[in-house]
């Protein structure tokens, strides 16, 4: 249903109205919900806010998104996920908030009716205004139009006063305006600087972590606020041919012993890999990978020390990812960002676990070929190529709040490229922010541990002698904005990470002067 339908135009008025709207670009109109006729038209882009504070909030979001898709609402972008303190009525549980951009042929009142139907089907009842609810769905924007009726006001009239609405809304935009529709949304703010200026007036990014609002990632039946400290991911290779420790942990007993050691040394995450991704590595089948992985994964998941820790599985096979999550894995770490298995994104969309998308050209056997080592601008090229993979993942149904990005240190890069990527994390975020603020806010994982470029710089041909260089590279990466570090030597790198976090915390704290 089109916007013209809601205007109530008929007969020979139709062409004139269409031409008028084309010239106008966007419009404001007043309409009653029943003043319409049925006509077909192109999709309108909309923004819908989501909130929940009753029951399983994450499940409520997933169910609402599924029902929205079934109702003719094609979701194209997701905001980050926020846990927020309740507003207005404060004696109630904390909320999860987010928002989505979507395309729909539904007219504004049809869209409203569809969302109200979803709310009702999910158990929402008429109760206290601003009170507890399993799901709350609000239309923030509808195309280029302002809508005024007895039951609907668009843009939503309280967008501008609510940080828990503005933060997800800003996530759905980029710092660059990507369409006339987005330009109209900025114009609706009433500020010369658009929505960006309005968000900054409210407090902008300084509000995140303050005022009871936290950007979070759902994982292992909890919510992870990765801004509080840097996480350490310990590497557990089950392969006979990994470049650093191949063959050391092929038995279940030795693998479990190594997992216990890394946990005792302070690892937050254990990343289990059963397929080598070193340069020139030969690929094994999913069946062979599962044969190596599952006995160890089951054994590690059963040890008491794993309580409170996260288990990641390093794989580019969707079949392996599916079985790993069934066995209890909390994260899937894919060095190919979905390029080596066409089913990966579809499977991950159903698994509801965080997904690490890494930048790599080619595959492990070809990534160091000359054609894969040519960059015009390393950080810009990584940003563009990685963002294109993440966008495909998002369109496939993996929400931005489950994405972790990895610039791919040591993969399809020369030594100088690795250094540029390691210290260029702010540039990578900035480039991605032009297209999507949500994706630019995603956690960034780096994995420089014992990589060849460190050996080249420090003249350390043996990988096991590169731990001091690894510590230095981890330090550089964390100080430049990395949120997760993937390392072989947990103990020493954890010390480096703690120092970096202390430096960053002191740097971000306001300076107080004695009177």
UniProtKB/Swiss-Prot annotation:
Q: How does activity depend on temperature?
A: Optimum temperature is 50 degrees Celsius.
Entry protein name:
Folate synthesis bifunctional protein, mitochondrial
Question: What's the gene?
Answer: MitHPPK/DHPS
State the needed cofactors, names only: Mg(2+)
Region annotation (DHPS) ranges = 232-515
| Family indicated by similarity | In the N-terminal section; belongs to the HPPK family.
Amino-acid positions noted as binding Mg(2+) in the UniProt annotation, renumbered to this chain: 237
What is annotated about its quaternary structure and interactions?
Homomultimer.
Query: Does the entry feature the keyword Methyltransferase, yes or no?
Result: no
Query: What pathway, per the record?
Result: Cofactor biosynthesis; tetrahydrofolate biosynthesis; 2-amino-4-hydroxy-6-hydroxymethyl-7,8-dihydropteridine diphosphate from 7,8-dihydroneopterin triphosphate: step 4/4; Cofactor biosynthesis; tetrahydrofolate biosynthesis; 7,8-dihydrofolate from 2-amino-4-hydroxy-6-hydroxymethyl-7,8-dihydropteridine diphosphate and 4-aminobenzoate: step 1/2
GO CC terms of this entry: mitochondrion
Has the keyword Zinc been applied to this entry? Answer: no
* Chief subcellular location: mitochondrion
Organism in which the protein naturally occurs: Pisum sativum (Garden pea)
């Amino acid at each position: 249903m089109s916007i013209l339908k809601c205007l109530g135009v008929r007969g020979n008025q139709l062409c004139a109205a269409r031409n008028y709207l084309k010239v106008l670009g966007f419009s404001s109109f007043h309409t009653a919900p029943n003043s319409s006729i049925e006509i077909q038209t192109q999709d309108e882009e909309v923004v819908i806010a989501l909130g929940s504070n009753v029951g399983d909030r994450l499940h409520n979001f997933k169910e609402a998104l599924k029902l929205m898709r079934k109702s003719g609402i094609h979701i194209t972008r997701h905001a980050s996920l926020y846990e927020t303190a309740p507003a207005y009525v404060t004696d109630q549980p904390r909320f999860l908030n987010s928002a989505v951009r979507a395309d729909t042929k539904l007219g504004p009142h049809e869209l409203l009716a569809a969302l109200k139907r979803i709310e009702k089907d999910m158990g929402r009842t008429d109760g206290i205004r601003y009170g507890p609810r399993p799901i709350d769905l609000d239309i923030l924007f509808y195309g280029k139009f302002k809508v005024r009726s007895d039951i609907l006001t668009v843009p939503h009239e309280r967008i501008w006063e609510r940080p828990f609405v503005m933060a997800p809304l800003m996530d759905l935009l980029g710092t660059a305006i990507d369409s006339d529709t987005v330009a109209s949304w900025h114009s609706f703010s009433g500020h010369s600087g658009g929505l960006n200026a309005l968000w900054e007036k409210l407090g902008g990014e300084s509000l995140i972590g303050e005022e009871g609002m936290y950007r979070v990632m759902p994982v292992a039946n909890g919510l992870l606020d990765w801004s509080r400290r840097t996480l350490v991911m310990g590497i557990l290779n089950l392969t006979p041919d990994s470049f650093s420790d191949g063959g050391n942990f092929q038995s279940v007993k030795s693998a479990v012993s190594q997992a216990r050691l890394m946990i005792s040394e302070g690892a937050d995450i254990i990343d289990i890999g059963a397929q080598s991704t070193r340069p020139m590595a030969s690929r094994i089948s999913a069946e062979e990978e599962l044969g190596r992985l599952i006995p160890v994964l089951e054994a590690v998941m059963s040890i008491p020390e794993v309580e409170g820790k996260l288990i990641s599985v390093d794989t580019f096979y969707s079949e392996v990812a599916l079985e790993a999550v069934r066995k209890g894995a909390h994260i899937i770490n894919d060095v190919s960002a979905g390029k080596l298995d066409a089913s990966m994104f579809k499977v991950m969309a159903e698994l509801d676990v965080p997904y690490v998308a890494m930048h790599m050209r080619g595959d492990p056997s070809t990534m160091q070929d000359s054609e894969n080592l040519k960059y015009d601008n390393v950080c810009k090229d990584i940003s563009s190529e990685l963002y294109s993979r993440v966008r495909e993942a998002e369109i496939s149904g993996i929400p931005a709040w489950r994405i972790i990005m990895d610039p791919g240190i040591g993969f399809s890069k020369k030594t100088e490229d690795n250094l540029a990527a390691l210290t260029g994390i702010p540039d990578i975020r900035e480039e991605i922010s032009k297209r999507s603020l949500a994706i630019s806010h995603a956690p960034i994982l780096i994995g420089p541990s014992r990589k060849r470029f460190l050996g080249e710089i420090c003249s350390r041909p043996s990988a096991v002698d590169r731990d001091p260089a690894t510590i230095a590279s981890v330090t550089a990466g964390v100080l430049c904005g990395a949120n997760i570090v993937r390392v072989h030597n947990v103990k020493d790198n954890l010390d480096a990470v703690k120092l970096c976090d202390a430096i960053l915390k002191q740097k971000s704290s306001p300076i107080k002067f004695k009177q």
